[in-house]
Structures are given as structure tokens and as C-alpha cells.
Amino acid sequence: MEFFRFINALLGFPEEERKKKQSSGGTHNEHKPEQQTNAQHPSPQPIHHTPPSHSSETNNEHKPTPTPIRPAPPPPPPIIRHLKTHGSGSTTTHNEHESTPPSHYIRPMPIEHEPTPSPQPVTHNSSTNNEHESTPLPTPTPPNSGNEHKSTSAPTPPGLHRTPLPTPPIHHGIPTQIPPKREPEHHTHGSTNNEHESKRSPIPTPPGLHRIPTPTPPTHQTSPSHSSGGTHNEHESHPPTLHIPPSHHIRPMPIPPNPPIVREPTPTPQPTPIPTPPRLHRIPTPTPPRTPQPTPPPTHGSSSTNSSGSTNNEHKPTPKPIPIPPTPPPPPPHHGIPTQIPPKHESEHHDHGSSSTNSSSSTSNSSSGGTNNEHESTPSPQPMPIEHKPEQQTNAQNRITPIINLSQTKQKTTEKQTSCTIQNLEYAIQIGNLTQAKKILNNLSSNGQISQTKVNMANTVIEGLTKLKMQNQPISNVLSNLTNSFQQMYQNYIRTGKMPDNLIELANVINAITSLLPQYSASVPPNVKAEISRLTVLQQGGSTGTVPAVFFQATEEQRPVSNLIVQ
């Protein structure tokens, strides 16, 4: 007892606690509830080895008598100290527990012999002590006999349990938090993480550690926490410290915003491609039609200066005024329409001014890349096309229109020339187009392109057919009808001696058609031709001897020839 008082005095324990320890054999249990309360927060990860450890403590509570055995083993305290030093890294907690460990170490000696450590529900009370009890767990893993034979090893775990409890919530809390994060699949350890977080809420690192350590040390801590209860946990307390810095290093990696670096290049290329396409579209339109380039230097030296200035403007991307590009688009319709038309017609005269401007601007654009040359070169061609292009258009139209008029007049004249021919007249008569034939006949007679005899024959044909109402009929049909009617009328004239009114007209029409269109003379029978010739002689008042048929008719009809001729 004096030895313990001396140790307590050295360690700074008050005598009241010592008396309490002496009075109650469950001093080991007194500290255990504290450990339980402290440990309940860390992580209730019930390792399967915990039940055997509790029975000894519960038995210790009921049996405080084994206190007299305390003085027997004074040497173990240094062993406990070494174990404690290995288990935890804080000296203050060692001093607190070093006073108690001898008592604990002594107490479990008889306690374990008497009750044969049945399941120790110490972990049930301090279910979270799995972190700290990880070391004793290997001893209880053998059945109860293991604890009986190793009485010294059994007491050490309680000491180990006590010493790490104050400090480990920092060290062990981290690993315990880490493995449950490694094992979100089971979801049983989530509550333990919350308990540890409640204790370590003031520590800023664990929240980051909860996020990051999940990927980093799964292999190290998941396997030991489940494979073996104790020694691995002690060693795990150290690896977490090793794993913590990587977590800190890992955290800053996502934190630095890389997106701004990606965003910076993206805006820069956008302005450059936007202006380029309009330039490409604008520049080629003026350049191809305007080939003459010798004139530009004298006419527009300013464009050459613009080319030199434009190179300076290239280095100044800021002067790219977007409001200016909209202004050039309206002229392009003016550029496009006139530029295509005038170079074909008036490139020699009127385009030299505008072409020189455009050619110089195109050369300047080609030399300088055309960043701002658009704005420099476009203003020069804009006024020029307005001045020249309308004139060019009007001139071109004036030139085009007279050509069309000439062609029309030529066509008209050719139609007149072709139409005013005897062949056309004959064709019109053949098809029965008497009106057109009349017009052609008048033109031919006025121009003197036809003989008077043909004019008379054509007139007789046209007038006779119109009078007989045989218009718009082919001449072949007309002849057949005329010959038939003439024969009938002529027979009647011979029988009666009375000449029909239309007989001579029919004879004249048939005679005119055959004379005007000799190809149709074969369609007229020869007797009809003879009869027609007789009638024509009688009509002309020829002598009696000239027309023998008349005498025959007179003798046949017994009428005087004079009467026949008169009729």
C-alpha cells in the first residue's frame, strides 16, 4: 500500500482516488466507464473478440476482494508503461494511467483465475473500445483458457485501453473513420464515424479526411481491422498519420481551379475566327473581277499606306471594331451586282478607278493578313461604286436594249422580205389563206416584184374564191369542185343556149389557178380546158371563125352565133 501511495504521489494522483480504489475493488471498472464514455464516441465497431473481455470486468465489479494481490507483482508496471508508450504517443495520459495500471494489472490476475473469462461485455459497455482494445483482442481470441494462462496479458489490455483513450480519439479516430469509409458497403460503421466526428468536431482535418482518405488507404486498414483485432489497430494508428498528409496533399489538387486556365484560351480563339470568315467572303468578291493592277499605285497611294498601316493594325487586335463590320455588309450587294456586270462590258473605261481601289485593297489585305484592312480598304471602294456603278448599269442597259431592238427590226425586215415573195403568195393560195395572199399581193405589186399578168391572175383567183366562199380550203379540193361545177353549168348552157351567170367566172378562176399554179393544171381535165378556152374567146369578143365550138353550138342549137356571143 505504501508503495502505491508513493507511486500515486509521484504520479500526482490524489489520495481520495487512491482510497476509492482501495475501498472498491472495481477501480478498474471505475476507469473503464470513463473509458467507455470516452470510447463510446469514437466508433462502436464491435469486434467479435470483445465479449470475452467484459466478463472479467463485470466479475471484477462484483468481486473487489482480489485487492490484496496488488502488492505481489510490482514489476509489471514498467512493462505496462512500455506497452502504453507503444500504444499511445501522449505522456500525460501515461502518467494518469500508469498509477492505475499496476492495480489493474494486479486485479485481473485473480479475477481471471476465479471467473474464467466468460464473454467480457466490456465492449458492450464500451463498444467503441475496439480501437483501444484491439491489442488485447488477440489474447482472448483463444478460448477462455487463453486469458486464464495469460493473466498478465489480460490486465495489460485494460491499461492499454485506458492509455490510448484520451489521445487516440485524434489518432485512432482518424483510422476508424477511414475504415468505415472504406466499408460503406456494410453501412454498420457509419454510426461510429458520427461518434468520432462528434469528438473531433473542433479538428478541421477530419472532414477533409472523411472525403479524401476513402480512396487512399483501403488496403491497409480495412484488412487489419477485420482480420485481427489488436496489434494491427495500434499500428494502424500510425499509418493514418502517414495517410493523413497524402489526404492533405490530395485535397489541394481538386481545390486549385484549373477551369480558368481552360476558359482563358477558349475566349481568345473565338474573337479571331469570327472576323476571319467575313473577310474571306468580302475580299474575294472585289478581287476576281478586277484584274487590272498597274493603275492602283498612281490612283490610290493611300491604299498602299493602308497596307503598311494595316500591318501595324494586325498587332493591335483591339481596334477590331465590331460595329464597323456591320457597315460594310450593306455595300456588298452593291459590290456584288455591279462588279459582275461592269467588268464584262466597261472594265476598260469605268472600272479602272474602282478596280484600282479594290486591287490595291486586295493586295494590302493579302500582305497584311486583312485584320483591319477591311475597315481601311472597304471605305475607299464604297463611295466609288456608288459613283460609277449606276452609270455602268445604265450604259450596259442602253447598249443591251438597242441590240435587242436591232434584232427585232431585223427579224421584222426579214419577215417582210421573206413574206413578200411570189412563193409565199402561191403558198398562201394553196392553203386557202386568201387574206394573207391579198396582203402579199399588194406588197409585191407595190414593190414591183411581180408581173402584172400574175397580179391579174392572183386577183382573179382571190376574188373568185372569196365570191364563191371557198376560203381556207386546199387548192386541190377547190379545183376539183370548180371543174365539176363548170362541166355541169356548161352542159346546161349547151342544152338551153342560156349561159349561167357564174360560168364565165368559174372558167376565169380555173384558168387563173392553172396559169398561176402550173403544177395543178394536170388535175383539170382536157375537155374542161378546151371549154374554158372557148368561153374566154367568146368573152373577149373574138371572130366567129376563131371559135369553131360556137358554130357547132349554134348549128346544134339552131340559134344565131351572134346571140350566143351576146349572151
Swiss-Prot record:
UniProt feature, compositional bias: Pro residues: 65-79, 253-278, 285-299, 319-335
Predominant location category: virion
Chain coiled-coil ranges: none
Bias (Basic and acidic residues): 180-200, 343-353
Keywords of the record: Virion
Domain of life: Viruses
Organism: Acidianus two-tailed virus (ATV)
Name of the featured protein: Structural protein ORF567
Bias-annotated ranges (Low complexity): 219-231, 300-312, 354-372
Compartments where located: Virion
Cellular component, GO, one term: virion component
Renumbered residue ranges of the record's region Disordered: 7-393
